[in-house]
Design a protein with these regions (language model features):
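Interfacial transmembrane-helix starts/ends
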Residues: 25, 87, 94-120, 137-140
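Interfacial segments at transmembrane-helix termini and the short loops linking adjacent helices
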Residues: 55, 100, 118-148, 194, ...
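Membrane-interface helix-loop junctions in multi-pass transport and translocation proteins
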Residues: 1, 126, 140, 164-167, ...
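Helix-loop junctions and terminal segments of transmembrane helices
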Residues: 68-93, 157-162
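Alpha-helical transmembrane segments of polytopic membrane transporters and translocases
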Residues: 30, 45-47, 59-75, 104, ...
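Helix-loop interface residues and adjacent transmembrane-helix termini in multi-pass membrane transporters
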Residues: 52-55, 89, 162-163, 190
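Membrane-interface junctions at transmembrane-helix termini in multi-pass inner-membrane proteins
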Residues: 144-174
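Interhelical loop/hinge segments that connect adjacent transmembrane helices in multipass membrane
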Residues: 1-42, 81, 88-97, 219-249
Length: 250
């Protein structure tokens, strides 16, 4: 069926385009490097903490990360919607307008969800993991505070990916690895489990701000403007509703 559709649409051809192949391979390599750095940055803290913390504290840290992770599922959904929307735009102004709407829509979910999570974290951890893991509550609350920085970083990364500018993403992830190492080296000996959580927040925030700085310098994107809420930002939720209905129909 897929082959028939491709043929009918005129996408199939025995002719090859060297320039197109080079462009696709180049984009894929840049995207892969950025992704590898991103994964390394996300796993580096646990690697270092497995040596720096006692096994019990490491277990509490993993629980804290696990319990706060679902907070950011909305950001992942927005990311999936944002990429094609930006890629469709021919002008930089259009790309930035779309980015702003989806970023603010994500914040409308992340910020209230974070406040609620901070309030119910003791009950949530006690219910899911048991009272023995309640010492992870403070670390989980601190990790949840990375929500805005995480949202900014993910949305800016998607903006760069859709605009075929992966260099800035790779640079920012490289900075993130450096920041993670330094923050853990300084904060874990001083504050233990809490220091590890603070280091993770710092490791999200500084690369996100660094990426924003580089993007502003290259494209003129106003980071302050991204936080200016508009009435039409709510339209994004209508698009989300339509997407979910299509999935249910499938």
């Amino acid at each position: 069926v897929a082959a028939f559709y491709v043929q009918k649409s005129g996408w199939a051809s025995v002719r090859t385009s060297v320039s197109t192949i080079k462009s696709l391979v180049g984009y894929g390599l840049r995207a892969h490097v950025a992704l590898v750095l991103q994964i390394a940055n996300r796993r580096l803290d646990q690697l270092i903490l497995s040596v720096a913390l006692a096994a019990s504290d490491l277990g509490l840290y993993v629980v804290a990360m696990t319990i706060e992770g679902p907070l950011f599922l909305a950001v992942t959904t927005m990311e999936m919607l944002l990429f094609p929307k930006i890629a469709q735009q021919l002008q930089e102004g259009g790309r930035q307008a779309v980015l702003g709407r989806y970023f603010r829509a994500a914040l409308l979910i992340v910020i209230p969800a974070t406040v609620i999570f901070i309030a119910i974290a003791p009950w949530l951890i006690g219910t899911v993991f048991g009272s023995a893991y309640l010492p992870a509550v403070d670390a989980a609350r601190i990790l949840a505070l990375s929500g805005i920085a995480y949202t900014l970083k993910v949305m800016l990364t998607t903006y760069m990916r859709a605009s075929n500018r992966m260099r800035i993403v790779a640079q920012s992830e490289g900075v993130g690895i450096f920041v993670t190492i330094i923050a853990l080296a300084v904060l874990v000996p001083l504050f233990g489990l809490i220091g590890a959580a603070i280091a993770q927040v710092v490791a999200f925030t500084i690369p996100a701000l660094f990426m924003a700085f580089l993007i502003n310098r290259e494209t003129g994107l106003s980071i302050v403007g991204l936080f200016r809420f508009e009435r039409r930002d709510w339209d994004v939720f209508g698009e989300l509703k339509t997407r979910f209905r299509r999935k249910e129909a499938e």
